A protein has these predicted regions:
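N-terminal cap/lid segment of alpha/beta-hydrolase-fold proteins
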Residues: 24-74
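Short beta-strand element of the alpha/beta-hydrolase
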Residues: 74-86
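Cap/lid segment of the alpha/beta-hydrolase catalytic domain
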Residues: 87-94, 113-138, 183, 298-299
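Alpha/beta-hydrolase fold nucleophile elbow
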Residues: 158-169
Length: 338
């Protein structure tokens, strides 16, 4: 839904009870107003930040999309979806259509702004300033973490079922979802030691809310992860659905360097590399690889249909997995319509 407001429906739920009910029955004539939940725009979740040039960022905000017909007497699972932009640009409005589509499948969806910017130069020629690039990735992880903490702390206010938080994104957004899901401060001190010392905690930036959320699943449309060693079921190995083209010029098929440039170390894990690590840990994982496709790969409708199906099966306790090519239908409930 795209009408950003929160309105009272011109309807009232009237509870009428038959005579002869139990002694604990509520009296007849009790009226309980129902609110229709409408999309909310520019909900602030982080404050007092600094961008890559040292300029002050007063706040970051999110947009919240509700399923059509969602009402205030119910809670709904949430998908937090990160926009693309190569860590140099983009904003939450770029994924409004994707959020609308996921909302149509019964999820509250959240799109949020995160800090972007680094000295890009020409990544294809291996001349990107990697220090500023890794800073940009780390800031985005901080901002994603702040968004998730805010959602966990304020779920009731927004009718979010905070027991069912899913995380996803496309391109840079997929990398944010993967990396921030698998990175807490203990991990950051090992894999992002320079950025941690320079930019601070990955889980305390932007707001003072505690990190109490639990991610129940990840959707990554052509994204990467900083290491496969962090996928460990003793700690975290999230149910995941992956999409990627097998001729992606920026990401490796399994493990390798950004744009194939060794000076962009450390190596990244993508596609088959993430899939293999999750299979090894016996975590539910679906991997779609499109032959001949670069970046991006699959169309949005196919991705949203299968993401929604995968997450719903995780919720029902019937997750599925497998590796597929082309547009192979795999959703157990999908037969033309979901």
């Amino acid at each position: 839904m795209r009408n950003f407001s929160f309105v009272l429906l011109p309807l009232v739920l009237s509870l009428s009870f038959l005579q002869g009910g139990s002694s604990g029955s509520k009296p007849t004539g009790v009226n309980m107003p129902l609110f229709e939940l409408r999309d909310l725009k520019d909900v602030e979740f982080a404050w007092n930040l600094t961008d890559w040039k040292g300029n002050k960022v007063d706040s970051l905000s999110m947009d919240i999309y509700y399923p059509t017909g969602a009402t205030s007497n119910k809670k709904y699972p949430v998908v937090v979806f990160c926009h693309a932009g190569g860590f140099t640009g983009g904003n939450k409005s770029n994924v409004s259509s994707l959020c609308d589509e996921l909302a149509d499948y019964g999820f509250i969806t959240v799109a949020f702004d995160y800090r972007t910017g680094y000295i890009k130069n020409n990544p294809h020629a291996c001349t990107t300033d990697t220090a500023t690039l890794f800073n940009a990735v780390y800031r985005a992880m901080q901002d994603g973490n702040a968004c998730l903490r805010f959602i966990q702390a304020n779920g009731k206010k927004y009718n979010i079922d905070a027991d069912w938080i899913f995380y996803g994104g496309s391109s840079a957004g997929a990398s944010i979802a993967l990396n921030s899901a698998y990175c807490n401060d203990s991990i950051a001190k090992i894999y992002f030691s320079r950025e941690y010392k320079l930019l601070g905690s990955v889980e305390k930036s932007g707001n003072t809310l505690p990190r109490n959320y639990a991610i129940k699943g990840i959707a990554a449309m052509w994204g990467s992860l900083f290491s496969d060693k962090v996928i460990d079921k003793k700690f975290r190995a999230y149910p995941t659905i992956l999409f990627k083209g097998d001729e992606d010029s920026g990401l490796p098929d399994s493990v390798g360097y950004f744009f194939g440039c060794p000076n962009y170390a450390p190596p990244l894990y993508a596609g088959a590399g993430i899939y293999a690590a999750l299979v090894k840990q016996k975590a539910p994982v679906v991997y779609y690889e499109l032959p001949g496709a670069n970046h991006p790969a699959y169309d949005d409708d196919f991705c949203m249909q299968n993401i929604a199906c995968f997450f719903k099966n995780v919720m029902s306790g019937t997750p599925y997995g497998g590796r597929y090519t082309y547009y192979t239908p795999t959703c157990p409930q999908f037969d033309g319509e979901f």
